[in-house]
């Protein structure tokens, strides 16, 4: 059994902070319109980026205890990315500030549990403030502003995202792909997306993106569970003979069938991906019929007297392209009959009109949109591969942030909404060490303004003093233009959901670090340095 090393109390917390600092100090230099770039050493060629979560994910520290701190702050970035797709750098900065300020006070004798409670209470108050100040996003101009700011002030990207949303709706499917030219453009194609990914990650043919993309694939649709290779041998023989790829949509694919498919994928003898059917119960049956109509196939169901083993060619659907990752499947340009698709949309519309329950109406409208709507594709072009990757990251961030803005509205950007929220905490009087937690949040939420100023070459304290002297809640420092002005009027705005999520995730991780009393990790006599840890 391998030896373990244990670190306790203040030593443990200080070591965690060291790890947090190494990640946060690398990430926070990218904050704001004048944020700097970070070059990542990849196996093929360096990647230049200012995307916080991308940078954070690349950092692994030699010291195992410090790496624990690094992983915790990386979790802040990942959670924020998952929730909103943007705001990871701000979230990382807030977590670092709360942890550092908290550890100072705990070292001076403050009670960690009470400090944590104070942080949680203050965070709730700031979230309330943000929701009260949030402004609903209405009109094309406001959406362009959000998208442009989130794309590091790239107006071309802002306009493209807005156009895409207008074409397919704010809840429509928008994907980002490489362009075959140097131009960045928008294309809208018919398609359907549902929230089911591949049944096994071993089916991901692109291991970097963790997805599989098929051009002109066959699509097998069934409401049965596939657990034996015998069930699908006739289908696989046809697909293999034509050199085509295959998407399997079934209740499940497991057992011998899944193992055999994965083995053939690894060997390169088959290009196949299996996903679970979307929905549940009767809704699943209806959605499978939607997919069948869209792709020109048949739902192979024993209720219809059909069996997989008795497969015929006409049962297979097809599409121009299919993309599958861990969470979703997108079918683009199904080869189904246009008239049948239109008839299916009319049937669903009639069901919407007679449905009584709101839930049922909502689900039917979603199906109608997926069947009758389209997929907007932003095709990204650039002079070099490095520039292309960086541009795609910015577009992804801007796309997610814009959707978040439509969902919860926007607040003044440039770190000002959090900065102004600090004043609302002045009236809180919790007493004892809970008040210490409030002061920690109050101090930390001013840091984004300081960091944006520092990255723009200005003195943070000077910028903070200028903003504080002005009574208008929208007054702040526009780093892009290097002027002080009404940021909301200038179009410097942030999605409320992004700011809120980043703050809540930062407070959550900070609370965990501040209440940590021991760290335990493996100890390798040959590789690991000796520290203040106890080795057992």
From Swiss-Prot:
Protein EC: 5.6.1.7
Pfam family, one: Cpn60_TCP1
Catalytic activity: ATP + H2O + a folded polypeptide = ADP + phosphate + an unfolded polypeptide
Positions bound to ATP: 30-33, 86-90, 414, 494
Keyword Cytoplasm: yes
Main location, first listed in the record: cytoplasm
Protein's GO biological process: protein folding; protein refolding
The keyword Nucleotide-binding appears for this protein: yes
Cellular component GO terms, alphabetical: cytoplasm
Organism superkingdom: Archaea
Record's keyword terms, sorted: ATP-binding, Chaperone, Cytoplasm, Isomerase, Nucleotide-binding
GO molecular function annotations of the record: ATP binding; ATP-dependent protein folding chaperone; isomerase activity; unfolded protein binding
Cellular compartment(s): Cytoplasm
Enzyme class: isomerase
HAMAP family: CH60
Record text on subunit structure and interactions: Forms a cylinder of 14 subunits composed of two heptameric rings stacked back-to-back. Interacts with the co-chaperonin GroES.
Purpose: Together with its co-chaperonin GroES, plays an essential role in assisting protein folding. The GroEL-GroES system forms a nano-cage that allows encapsulation of the non-native substrate proteins and provides a physical environment optimized to promote and accelerate protein folding.
Family: Belongs to the chaperonin (HSP60) family.
Protein name: Chaperonin GroEL
Organism expressing this protein natively: Methanosarcina acetivorans (strain ATCC 35395 / DSM 2834 / JCM 12185 / C2A)
């Amino acid at each position: 059994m391998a030896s373990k090393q244990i670190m306790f109390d203040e030593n443990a917390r200080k070591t965690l902070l060291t790890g947090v600092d190494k990640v946060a100090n690398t990430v926070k230099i990218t904050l704001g319109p004048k944020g700097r770039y970070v070059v990542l050493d990849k196996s093929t060629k360096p990647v230049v980026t200012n995307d916080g979560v991308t940078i954070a994910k690349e950092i692994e520290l030699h010291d195992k205890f410090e790496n624990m701190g690094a992983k915790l702050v990386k979790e802040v970035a990942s959670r924020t990315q998952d929730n909103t797709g943007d705001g990871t750098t701000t979230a990382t900065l807030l977590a670092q500030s709360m942890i550092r300020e908290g550890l100072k006070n705990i070292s001076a004798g403050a009670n960690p549990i009470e400090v944590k409670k104070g942080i949680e209470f203050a965070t709730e108050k700031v979230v309330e403030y943000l929701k009260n100040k949030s402004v609903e996003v209405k009109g094309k101009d406001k959406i362009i502003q959000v998208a442009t700011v989130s794309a590091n002030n790239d107006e071309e990207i802002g306009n493209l995202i807005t156009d895409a949303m207008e074409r397919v709706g704010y809840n429509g499917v928008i994907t980002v792909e490489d362009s075959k030219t140097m131009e960045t453009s928008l294309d809208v194609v018919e398609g359907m997306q549902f929230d089911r990914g591949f049944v096994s990650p071993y089916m991901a043919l692109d291991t970097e993106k963790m997805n599989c993309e098929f051009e002109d694939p066959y699509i097998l649709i069934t409401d049965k569970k596939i657990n034996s290779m015998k069930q699908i041998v006739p289908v696989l023989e046809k697909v293999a003979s034509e050199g085509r790829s295959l998407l399997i949509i079934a209740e499940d694919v497991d057992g011998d069938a899944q193992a055999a498919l994965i083995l053939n994928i690894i060997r390169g003898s088959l290009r196949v991906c299996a996903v679970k059917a979307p929905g549940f119960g009767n809704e699943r049956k209806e959605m499978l019929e939607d997919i069948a109509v869209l792709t020109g196939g048949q739902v192979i169901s024993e209720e219809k007297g059909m069996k997989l083993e008795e497969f015929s060619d006409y049962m297979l659907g097809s599409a121009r392209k299919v993309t599958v990752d861990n969470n979703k499947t997108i079918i683009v340009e199904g080869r189904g009959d246009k008239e049948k698709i239109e008839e299916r949309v009319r049937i669903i519309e009639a069901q919407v009109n007679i449905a009584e329950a709101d839930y049922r109406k909502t689900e039917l409208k979603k199906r109608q949109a997926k069947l009758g709507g389209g997929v907007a594709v932003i095709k990204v072009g650039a002079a070099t591969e490095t520039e292309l990757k960086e541009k795609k990251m910015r577009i992804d961030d801007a796309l997610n942030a814009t959707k978040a803005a439509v969902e919860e509205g926007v607040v003044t950007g440039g770190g000002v909404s959090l900065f102004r929220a600090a004043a609302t905490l002045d009236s809180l009087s919790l007493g004892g060490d809970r008040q210490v937690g409030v002061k920690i949040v109050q101090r930390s939420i001013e840091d984004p303004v300081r960091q944006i100023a520092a990255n723009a070459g200005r003195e943070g304290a000077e910028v903070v003093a200028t903003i504080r002297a002005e009574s208008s809640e929208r007054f702040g420092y526009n780093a892009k233009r290097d002027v002080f002005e009404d940021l909301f009027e200038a179009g410097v705005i942030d999605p409320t959901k992004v700011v809120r999520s980043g703050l809540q995730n930062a407070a959550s991780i900070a609370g965990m670090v501040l209440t940590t009393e021991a760290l335990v990790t493996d100890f390798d006599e040959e590789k690991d340095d000796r520290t203040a840890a106890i080795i057992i």
